[in-house]
């Protein structure tokens, strides 16, 4: 008995779609799977235009996308795990982190509709509104918003979470949030996964804190610099510091060892002079211990110190007088208003 073979007939336009997806995958070093649920067609077209300079956005039926992935390499086939609900593919030459950042920045606030589930806590802040007293007060209270009238305006009395994450938003609350211009949702292209050179990157990996990363690099560079200086390991970055440190260390050794070199003599003479003056000061109680020249030098040093002390005392007296005048002025101001 002859065996019957049945083959599924696929329309040409579907074959063309599958081939186009396969061609795009081969033409770009990176492609990603994007969620587009909840995005109006008009807004999606606008996003496609905004992306055209650095990426290609391809919207296709999930069944055709899966066929294209299944006919590609083993690495590409793994991306089938991220095909779900409303999906699009994006193809680019950008790196995964830059792509994720660009897509996140393109997201815009959007009102939540009745029956939708809150993805995070929806908060209304305490403060005045632009609404005059009227029926809206009852509408706000009916939606669970703590509203009252104050100064001829409707105000929100306290900050409150009117819907918790995971809760379904009611018709009344959805309408009132829109009137208050509170848009809890972010509408945009939701990157689910990216494939680059056989590696799959998901949002939890791509969502990096750039400021923290930069701070870590700066700290690491500083630590590496300090380590290289302490280890006396010369590099283009630290050579000036090492030379300055070596010069300072050698100068200290020469001074402590009393080495008579041109660059050291002034320091040694200054050090010897200071010691001489200290000894002279200690011996000055005996008139015969010092000659006239040394007495004169010691007197000049003493006069210089006295002059400095007098200047300091005068400055302190002026400061005290200014404080007294300020206190007196404050007292008169308090007395006469």
Curated annotation (Swiss-Prot):
The gene is rpl10. Signal peptide: none annotated. It comes from Methanococcoides burtonii (strain DSM 6242 / NBRC 107633 / OCM 468 / ACE-M). Forms part of the ribosomal stalk, playing a central role in the interaction of the ribosome with GTP-bound translation factors. SUPFAM superfamilies: Ribosomal protein L10-like. This is Large ribosomal subunit protein uL10. It comes from the Archaea. GO terms for biological process: cytoplasmic translation; ribosomal large subunit assembly. GO terms for molecular function: large ribosomal subunit rRNA binding; structural constituent of ribosome. GO terms for cellular component: cytosolic large ribosomal subunit. Keywords: Ribonucleoprotein, Ribosomal protein, RNA-binding, rRNA-binding. Belongs to the universal ribosomal protein uL10 family. Residues 309-337 are annotated as: Disordered. PANTHER family: 60S ACIDIC RIBOSOMAL PROTEIN P0 (PTHR45699), LARGE RIBOSOMAL SUBUNIT PROTEIN UL10 (PTHR45699:SF3). Part of the 50S ribosomal subunit. Forms part of the ribosomal stalk which helps the ribosome interact with GTP-bound translation factors. Forms a heptameric L10(L12)2(L12)2(L12)2 complex, where L10 forms an elongated spine to which the L12 dimers bind in a sequential fashion. Residues 310-327 have a biased composition (Acidic residues).
